[in-house]
Amino acid sequence: MADTGSVHRGVAWQAQALYVRALLRLLPLLINVFRHASPKIRAEIDYLQPGYTFQLSVQGTDFAGTCRRTDAGSFKRVPPARIARDVEPGSGLPSSDPQAVTVDYVIDFRSLPFAFRCFSGGETLKQALGERAFSTRGPNDTGVALTYMFTALLKMFFGWRAAYRNAPKARRRAA
């Protein structure tokens, strides 16, 4: 008889993996759609220069999504084959291959469950950062812009989740 605990863990992992892969694949589309609805997202995108490239990845898997800002201010997905292999992503070093795309900033989640919790609205980026759910590589100024952009994006997408709802305001007592 199979151990049902490991079977459930396997199914849960596969469901989380499918969800995270789908969101990584859809990331440029989501950014491009939500930038039209949010001035905050637009402001952070405007801070990033055309050609700026960032990557979200999940340790222990081959899951990664790489996006590059266009001259028009939208983001396009970068296929894995086009990413520079001769320099560390987020290092700021140029590639010796002029056709390769160098990654300017990397957000690397420690594990699939951490990525899933962030991508599903189960916890905010601030909470995830507090528990060291991800590490980053790249310049701090653009990292802050990406963090603000993702916070606004996730709040719009998951505003109904407890992690993103505003704390209840204290009610005044009638005197």
Locations of the language-model features?
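Feature captures hydrophobic
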Residues: 1-175
